[in-house]
Amino acid sequence: MDSPTILTPRDWPSHPAYVHPDYRSSVKRGPTRPMIPLKERLRDQYAPVYGAEDLGPLDHDLTKNAVKNGEPLGERIVVTGRVLDEGGKPVRNTLVEVWQANAAGRYVHKVDQHDAPLDPNFLGAGRCMTDAEGRYRFLTIKPGAYPWGNHPNAWRPNHIHFSLFGDYFGSRLVTQMYFPGDPLLAYDPIFQGTPEAARDRLISRFSLDTTEEGHALGYEFDIVLRGRDATPMER
């Protein structure tokens, strides 16, 4: 049996600042006063517990979990990886949730008024549990880029949002996964707001081993919840 991981203070220099001037909305909603440290309490040492019985059989397959009258449009991809704690141990049986735009760069919600088509067979949301090795796996459609009005001719790179609790409330993480070689990364203030030394932790790796022949390209994205090598959080 693994020994419990001791939670150490977060490595804040690896994460984006709360206020990043180039990311306009962060200036409006970011805190303007110093943070007040809180003592660790019992509730911070535990997290909600989910099991396989809480999931549907197609929750992990975004290409099938919202089908109405056909297949979703776009490039099929497999996204998989391991969830690790700050000690490098796998985080087993933890819930991983994702959401994303469709292949045209459109989200399924009323606030998204981007002039791009919705896909009636694609919801853009899924979830799964990690296995005994801390591994998760999703089958989905590669999301498209979309304009977002932050600055002139601003476009978000292709990305997938991730949400995890891990074993503790103190390891809560919401982040974004990007794709290798995306030219928009150099112009995106959300990605660029992450300290340079930690940006590569947000970029998935193409994997021929994960690729399903004739069906879907594969990408690996490992997630570290805390510690010196933590995956940077989304602000």
From Swiss-Prot:
Gene3D superfamilies, per the entry: Aromatic compound dioxygenase
Keyword Iron: yes
Cofactor: Fe(3+)
Function: Plays an essential role in the utilization of numerous aromatic and hydroaromatic compounds via the beta-ketoadipate pathway.
The protein's Enzyme Commission number: 1.13.11.3
Source species of the chain: Burkholderia cepacia
Major enzyme class: oxidoreductase
Catalytic reaction equation(s): 3,4-dihydroxybenzoate + O2 = 3-carboxy-cis,cis-muconate + 2 H(+)
Domain of life: Bacteria
Subunit structure and binding partners: The enzyme is an oligomer of 12 copies of the alpha and beta chains.
GO MF annotation terms: ferric iron binding; protocatechuate 3,4-dioxygenase activity
A GO BP annotation: 3,4-dihydroxybenzoate catabolic process
Matches recorded under Pfam families: Dioxygenase_C (PF00775), PCDO_beta_N (PF12391)
Keyword list, A-Z: Aromatic hydrocarbons catabolism, Dioxygenase, Iron, Metal-binding, Oxidoreductase
Protein name: Protocatechuate 3,4-dioxygenase beta chain
